[in-house]
Amino acid sequence: MKVAVIYFGGQYNHLIVKDLKYLGLEAVAITPDKSVEELKEFDSVVFGGGPYSVINELDKMGFAPDYVKSLNVPKLGICLGHQLIAKVLGGEVRKANKPEYGLTTVNIVDEDTILRGLKPSIKAWESHNDEVVRPPSGFRILASSENAKVQAMVNNDNSIFGVQFHPEVKHTEKGIEVFKNFIKICRK
C-alpha cells in the first residue's frame, strides 16, 4: 500500500513516514504543491501537522484542500490535518479557548474504528492553538479531552478520520495502534 504523507512543515511529520514504513507501507512525504492528479497513484493520504492555521492561512496549504475534497481514498488528518479536513468539509475550527501542549488525557467515546483497543482513555501528545469545535456534517466524534471536544472524528462511511493529538510521537500511549487501525481500514 502506498501512502502520501502531506508535509506542511510540521516538526513530527517525518515520524509519520517512519511509523508507516515500520508497519510495512510505502510512505512518501509530499509537499502540497503537487496537483491532485499527481496524488492519484496513492492508496491513502495522511495529512500531517504544521505551523499554519486553517482559520486564516488556508492559502498557504497549496492543493491540500483539493486533496481532501477530490481524492477518493481513505484519509487521516493529524493535528493541522484534522483541522484541515474539518474546515474544508464544512466543520468549524476556532482558536482554542485553552491550547493544549504536552501530554493530555484523551477520552475515547467511540472506539469502533481508528481508536479500536484504546478505550477508555490514552495519554496523548498535543501541540495546537486551534481546534475543531464542530465536525462536518456526516461525521461523528470519537474522542474528546477536557479542553477539546473533538479530539478525533470519522465520517459516516469510515473513510475519513481526524485526530487532534499526535499518534506519531512516542509519548502518545498506543499511538502506533492508531496507524495499525487506519491501515486495516484502508485494506478493507
From Swiss-Prot:
It is an enzyme of class 6 (ligase). Pfam families: GATase (PF00117). GO terms for molecular function: ATP binding; GMP synthase activity. SUPFAM superfamilies: Class I glutamine amidotransferase-like. Its EC number is 6.3.5.2. It catalyses: XMP + L-glutamine + ATP + H2O = GMP + L-glutamate + AMP + diphosphate + 2 H(+). Keywords: ATP-binding, Glutamine amidotransferase, GMP biosynthesis, Ligase, Nucleotide-binding, Purine biosynthesis. InterPro entries: Class_I_gatase-like, GATASE, GMP_synth_GATase, GMP_synthase_A. GO terms for cellular component: cytosol. Pathway: Purine metabolism; GMP biosynthesis; GMP from XMP (L-Gln route): step 1/1. The active site is at 79 (nucleophile), 166, 168. Residues 2-188 form the Glutamine amidotransferase type-1 domain. Catalyzes the synthesis of GMP from XMP. NCBIfam families: guaA_Nterm (TIGR00888), PRK00758.1 (NF001975). Heterodimer composed of a glutamine amidotransferase subunit (A) and a GMP-binding subunit (B). This is GMP synthase [glutamine-hydrolyzing] subunit A. It comes from Sulfolobus acidocaldarius (strain ATCC 33909 / DSM 639 / JCM 8929 / NBRC 15157 / NCIMB 11770).
